[in-house]
Protein backbone atom coordinates (compact mmCIF):
# COMPACT_ATOMS: atom_id res chain seq x y z
CA UNK A 1 0.00 0.00 0.00
CA UNK A 2 1.29 3.45 -0.86
CA UNK A 3 1.87 6.07 1.81
CA UNK A 4 0.76 9.71 1.63
CA UNK A 5 3.12 12.09 -0.13
CA UNK A 6 5.59 13.84 2.18
CA UNK A 7 5.73 16.75 -0.26
CA UNK A 8 3.22 17.95 -2.82
CA UNK A 9 3.62 20.48 -5.60
CA UNK A 10 0.80 22.50 -7.12
CA UNK A 11 1.10 23.97 -10.62
CA UNK A 12 -1.53 26.39 -11.95
CA UNK A 13 -0.37 26.08 -15.56
CA UNK A 14 -1.06 29.21 -17.61
CA UNK A 15 0.97 31.93 -19.30
CA UNK A 16 1.41 33.24 -15.75
CA UNK A 17 1.96 30.07 -13.72
CA UNK A 18 1.56 29.70 -9.98
CA UNK A 19 3.74 27.21 -8.08
CA UNK A 20 3.11 25.98 -4.54
CA UNK A 21 5.09 23.49 -2.48
CA UNK A 22 3.72 21.95 0.72
CA UNK A 23 5.73 19.76 3.10
CA UNK A 24 3.59 17.36 5.12
CA UNK A 25 4.40 16.19 8.64
CA UNK A 26 2.60 13.89 11.05
CA UNK A 27 0.44 16.65 12.55
CA UNK A 28 0.85 19.68 10.30
CA UNK A 29 1.60 20.85 6.77
CA UNK A 30 3.87 23.74 5.85
CA UNK A 31 3.76 25.93 2.75
CA UNK A 32 7.44 26.37 1.86
CA UNK A 33 7.19 27.79 -1.65
CA UNK A 34 4.63 30.05 -3.25
CA UNK A 35 5.52 32.07 -6.30
CA UNK A 36 4.33 33.06 -9.74
CA UNK A 37 6.29 32.64 -12.97
CA UNK A 38 5.29 35.70 -14.96
CA UNK A 39 5.62 34.29 -18.49
CA UNK A 40 6.13 30.63 -19.37
CA UNK A 41 6.17 31.47 -23.09
CA UNK A 42 9.79 32.49 -22.52
CA UNK A 43 12.51 29.86 -22.27
CA UNK A 44 13.46 31.08 -18.80
CA UNK A 45 9.89 30.92 -17.52
CA UNK A 46 9.24 27.45 -18.92
CA UNK A 47 12.51 26.15 -17.47
CA UNK A 48 11.44 27.24 -13.98
CA UNK A 49 8.20 25.27 -14.25
CA UNK A 50 9.88 22.25 -15.83
CA UNK A 51 12.64 22.12 -13.21
CA UNK A 52 10.06 22.25 -10.41
CA UNK A 53 8.14 19.26 -11.82
CA UNK A 54 11.31 17.31 -12.63
CA UNK A 55 12.57 17.81 -9.06
CA UNK A 56 9.23 16.71 -7.67
CA UNK A 57 9.05 13.53 -9.73
CA UNK A 58 12.68 12.67 -9.03
CA UNK A 59 12.06 12.89 -5.28
CA UNK A 60 8.78 10.98 -5.34
CA UNK A 61 6.60 14.00 -4.56
CA UNK A 62 3.05 14.21 -5.89
CA UNK A 63 2.18 16.95 -8.35
CA UNK A 64 -1.22 18.47 -9.09
CA UNK A 65 -1.44 20.40 -12.37
CA UNK A 66 -4.34 22.61 -13.39
CA UNK A 67 -4.31 21.92 -17.14
CA UNK A 68 -6.09 19.37 -19.33
CA UNK A 69 -4.04 16.20 -19.79
CA UNK A 70 -5.59 15.42 -23.17
CA UNK A 71 -8.13 16.19 -25.89
CA UNK A 72 -11.58 14.64 -26.44
CA UNK A 73 -11.20 11.29 -28.19
CA UNK A 74 -13.68 12.25 -30.93
CA UNK A 75 -11.72 15.44 -31.59
CA UNK A 76 -8.49 13.47 -31.90
CA UNK A 77 -10.13 11.06 -34.33
CA UNK A 78 -11.30 13.99 -36.45
CA UNK A 79 -7.78 15.43 -36.58
CA UNK A 80 -6.37 12.03 -37.57
CA UNK A 81 -8.98 11.76 -40.30
CA UNK A 82 -8.08 15.17 -41.66
CA UNK A 83 -4.49 14.00 -42.01
CA UNK A 84 -5.70 10.92 -43.92
CA UNK A 85 -8.42 12.05 -46.34
CA UNK A 86 -8.49 8.59 -47.96
CA UNK A 87 -10.08 7.23 -44.79
CA UNK A 88 -7.84 4.16 -44.79
CA UNK A 89 -6.72 4.52 -41.19
CA UNK A 90 -9.42 6.42 -39.35
CA UNK A 91 -12.27 7.20 -41.71
CA UNK A 92 -13.27 10.47 -43.31
CA UNK A 93 -13.80 13.40 -40.93
CA UNK A 94 -17.24 13.73 -42.51
CA UNK A 95 -18.33 10.21 -41.54
CA UNK A 96 -18.65 11.08 -37.87
CA UNK A 97 -22.21 11.54 -36.70
CA UNK A 98 -21.30 14.43 -34.41
CA UNK A 99 -21.93 18.01 -35.46
CA UNK A 100 -18.75 20.16 -35.77
CA UNK A 101 -19.07 21.46 -32.21
CA UNK A 102 -20.94 18.58 -30.62
CA UNK A 103 -20.29 17.64 -27.00
CA UNK A 104 -18.22 14.62 -28.03
CA UNK A 105 -15.70 16.79 -29.86
CA UNK A 106 -15.69 19.67 -27.39
CA UNK A 107 -15.79 18.05 -23.95
CA UNK A 108 -13.79 15.20 -22.47
CA UNK A 109 -15.67 12.54 -20.51
CA UNK A 110 -13.98 13.62 -17.27
CA UNK A 111 -15.15 17.21 -17.82
CA UNK A 112 -18.76 16.04 -18.06
CA UNK A 113 -18.35 14.10 -14.80
CA UNK A 114 -16.80 17.17 -13.18
CA UNK A 115 -19.72 19.34 -14.28
CA UNK A 116 -22.21 16.84 -12.85
CA UNK A 117 -20.32 16.86 -9.53
CA UNK A 118 -19.67 20.58 -9.19
CA UNK A 119 -21.88 22.41 -11.66
CA UNK A 120 -18.76 24.04 -13.13
CA UNK A 121 -18.13 24.08 -16.88
CA UNK A 122 -14.47 23.29 -17.62
CA UNK A 123 -12.85 25.36 -20.36
CA UNK A 124 -12.82 23.24 -23.51
CA UNK A 125 -9.37 22.03 -24.56
CA UNK A 126 -10.40 22.16 -28.22
CA UNK A 127 -12.31 25.42 -28.70
CA UNK A 128 -10.63 27.63 -26.10
CA UNK A 129 -7.50 28.99 -27.72
CA UNK A 130 -5.68 29.81 -24.48
CA UNK A 131 -6.23 26.28 -23.16
CA UNK A 132 -5.27 24.30 -26.26
CA UNK A 133 -1.65 25.41 -26.07
CA UNK A 134 -1.41 24.39 -22.43
CA UNK A 135 -2.69 20.89 -23.23
CA UNK A 136 0.31 20.51 -25.53
CA UNK A 137 2.66 22.14 -23.01
CA UNK A 138 1.41 19.84 -20.27
CA UNK A 139 1.81 16.74 -22.43
CA UNK A 140 5.36 17.77 -23.34
CA UNK A 141 6.11 18.31 -19.66
CA UNK A 142 4.75 14.92 -18.58
CA UNK A 143 6.53 13.19 -21.46
CA UNK A 144 9.86 14.70 -20.42
CA UNK A 145 9.34 13.81 -16.76
CA UNK A 146 7.69 10.38 -17.05
CA UNK A 147 8.78 9.14 -20.47
CA UNK A 148 6.81 6.75 -22.61
CA UNK A 149 8.21 3.57 -21.10
CA UNK A 150 7.22 4.10 -17.47
CA UNK A 151 3.50 3.76 -16.75
CA UNK A 152 2.55 5.60 -19.92
CA UNK A 153 -0.70 3.65 -20.23
CA UNK A 154 -1.91 5.19 -16.96
CA UNK A 155 0.01 8.44 -17.39
CA UNK A 156 -3.10 10.54 -17.98
CA UNK A 157 -4.84 9.05 -14.96
CA UNK A 158 -1.96 9.95 -12.64
CA UNK A 159 -2.72 7.14 -10.18
CA UNK A 160 0.64 5.44 -10.67
CA UNK A 161 2.82 8.35 -11.80
CA UNK A 162 2.05 10.82 -9.02
CA UNK A 163 1.31 13.58 -11.55
CA UNK A 164 -2.42 14.29 -11.52
CA UNK A 165 -4.80 16.63 -13.30
CA UNK A 166 -6.74 18.87 -10.93
CA UNK A 167 -9.30 21.65 -11.32
CA UNK A 168 -9.30 24.22 -8.48
CA UNK A 169 -12.55 25.91 -9.61
CA UNK A 170 -14.47 22.64 -9.24
CA UNK A 171 -12.87 21.87 -5.86
CA UNK A 172 -13.78 25.33 -4.55
CA UNK A 173 -17.35 24.86 -5.73
CA UNK A 174 -17.58 21.49 -3.96
CA UNK A 175 -16.19 23.12 -0.80
CA UNK A 176 -18.81 25.91 -1.13
CA UNK A 177 -16.11 28.57 -1.15
CA UNK A 178 -17.11 32.25 -1.44
CA UNK A 179 -15.13 32.71 -4.65
CA UNK A 180 -16.73 35.97 -5.79
CA UNK A 181 -14.56 37.38 -8.58
CA UNK A 182 -11.24 36.46 -6.98
CA UNK A 183 -9.53 36.17 -10.36
CA UNK A 184 -9.89 39.91 -10.95
CA UNK A 185 -10.83 41.36 -7.56
CA UNK A 186 -8.18 41.41 -4.83
CA UNK A 187 -10.75 42.02 -2.09
CA UNK A 188 -12.51 38.80 -3.09
CA UNK A 189 -9.16 36.99 -3.21
CA UNK A 190 -8.29 38.13 0.31
CA UNK A 191 -11.73 37.02 1.46
CA UNK A 192 -11.15 33.60 -0.09
CA UNK A 193 -7.82 33.22 1.71
CA UNK A 194 -9.46 34.16 5.02
CA UNK A 195 -12.25 31.66 4.34
CA UNK A 196 -9.73 28.86 3.78
CA UNK A 197 -7.76 29.47 6.96
CA UNK A 198 -10.59 30.57 9.26
CA UNK A 199 -13.70 28.72 8.13
CA UNK A 200 -12.39 25.38 6.88
CA UNK A 201 -10.63 24.22 10.06
CA UNK A 202 -7.18 23.97 8.51
CA UNK A 203 -5.24 24.98 11.62
CA UNK A 204 -2.78 22.26 10.59
CA UNK A 205 -1.82 24.30 7.48
CA UNK A 206 0.86 26.90 8.14
CA UNK A 207 3.45 29.06 6.44
CA UNK A 208 7.19 28.44 6.65
CA UNK A 209 8.94 30.57 9.24
CA UNK A 210 12.25 30.55 7.38
CA UNK A 211 14.62 33.50 7.44
CA UNK A 212 14.21 36.79 5.64
CA UNK A 213 10.56 37.21 6.56
CA UNK A 214 9.59 34.23 4.40
CA UNK A 215 6.26 33.73 6.16
CA UNK A 216 5.07 37.22 5.30
CA UNK A 217 6.37 36.99 1.74
CA UNK A 218 4.38 33.80 1.23
CA UNK A 219 1.26 35.32 2.76
CA UNK A 220 1.52 38.48 0.66
CA UNK A 221 1.88 36.39 -2.48
CA UNK A 222 -1.17 34.33 -1.57
CA UNK A 223 -3.26 37.42 -0.81
CA UNK A 224 -2.31 39.22 -4.02
CA UNK A 225 -1.91 36.55 -6.73
CA UNK A 226 -4.87 34.38 -7.74
CA UNK A 227 -2.44 32.10 -9.62
CA UNK A 228 -0.67 31.39 -6.32
CA UNK A 229 -3.96 30.62 -4.57
CA UNK A 230 -4.95 28.19 -7.32
CA UNK A 231 -1.53 26.54 -7.07
CA UNK A 232 -2.14 26.04 -3.34
CA UNK A 233 -5.43 24.28 -4.10
CA UNK A 234 -3.59 22.12 -6.67
CA UNK A 235 -1.05 21.09 -4.03
CA UNK A 236 -3.80 20.21 -1.54
CA UNK A 237 -5.60 17.99 -4.04
CA UNK A 238 -2.30 16.33 -4.99
CA UNK A 239 -1.98 15.27 -1.35
CA UNK A 240 -5.54 13.94 -1.42
CA UNK A 241 -4.73 11.91 -4.53
CA UNK A 242 -1.75 10.36 -2.72
CA UNK A 243 -3.71 9.15 0.32
CA UNK A 244 -4.05 5.41 1.01
CA UNK A 245 -6.96 4.09 -0.96
CA UNK A 246 -6.58 6.74 -3.66
CA UNK A 247 -9.90 8.50 -2.95
CA UNK A 248 -9.69 10.52 -6.17
CA UNK A 249 -8.63 7.59 -8.38
CA UNK A 250 -11.14 6.54 -11.10
CA UNK A 251 -10.51 2.89 -10.22
CA UNK A 252 -12.57 3.48 -7.08
CA UNK A 253 -15.65 4.22 -9.17
CA UNK A 254 -17.81 1.75 -11.07
CA UNK A 255 -16.68 2.72 -14.54
CA UNK A 256 -16.71 0.24 -17.41
CA UNK A 257 -13.47 -0.88 -19.11
CA UNK A 258 -14.44 1.27 -22.11
CA UNK A 259 -14.81 4.33 -19.90
CA UNK A 260 -11.44 3.67 -18.26
CA UNK A 261 -9.82 3.44 -21.69
CA UNK A 262 -11.36 6.81 -22.50
CA UNK A 263 -9.95 8.36 -19.31
CA UNK A 264 -6.50 6.96 -20.12
CA UNK A 265 -6.70 8.68 -23.50
CA UNK A 266 -8.35 11.96 -22.50
CA UNK A 267 -7.22 12.41 -18.91
CA UNK A 268 -8.93 12.29 -15.52
CA UNK A 269 -9.69 15.26 -13.24
CA UNK A 270 -9.06 14.37 -9.59
CA UNK A 271 -11.90 15.82 -7.49
CA UNK A 272 -12.27 15.98 -3.70
CA UNK A 273 -15.14 14.14 -1.98
CA UNK A 274 -18.51 15.81 -2.50
CA UNK A 275 -18.67 17.52 0.90
CA UNK A 276 -17.79 21.08 2.06
CA UNK A 277 -14.92 20.00 4.31
CA UNK A 278 -11.16 19.52 4.22
CA UNK A 279 -11.02 17.33 7.33
CA UNK A 280 -9.71 14.41 5.28
CA UNK A 281 -6.50 16.38 4.64
CA UNK A 282 -5.65 16.77 8.33
CA UNK A 283 -2.24 15.00 8.66
CA UNK A 284 -3.14 13.85 12.17
CA UNK A 285 -6.29 12.10 10.99
CA UNK A 286 -5.58 10.45 7.64
CA UNK A 287 -8.63 8.50 6.46
CA UNK A 288 -8.22 4.97 5.14
CA UNK A 289 -10.51 4.16 2.25
CA UNK A 290 -9.18 0.74 1.31
CA UNK A 291 -6.40 -0.42 -0.96
CA UNK A 292 -7.00 0.00 -4.67
CA UNK A 293 -6.34 -3.32 -6.46
CA UNK A 294 -5.51 -1.54 -9.71
CA UNK A 295 -3.20 1.35 -8.80
CA UNK A 296 -1.86 -0.20 -5.58
CA UNK A 297 -2.99 2.71 -3.45
Model feature map: region roles:
Residues 2-9, 13-296:
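RNase H-like (RuvC/DEDD) metal-dependent nuclease/polynucleotide-processing core
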Amino acid sequence: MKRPADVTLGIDLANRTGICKIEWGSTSATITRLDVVQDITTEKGWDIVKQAVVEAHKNGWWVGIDAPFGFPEAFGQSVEALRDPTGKTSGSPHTFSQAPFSDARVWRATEKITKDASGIDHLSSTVTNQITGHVINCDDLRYEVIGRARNWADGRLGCTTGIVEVYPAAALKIWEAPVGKYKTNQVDLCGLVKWLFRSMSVSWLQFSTGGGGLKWKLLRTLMSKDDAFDALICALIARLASLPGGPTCPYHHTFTPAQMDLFRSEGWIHLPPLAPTLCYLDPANIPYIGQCPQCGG
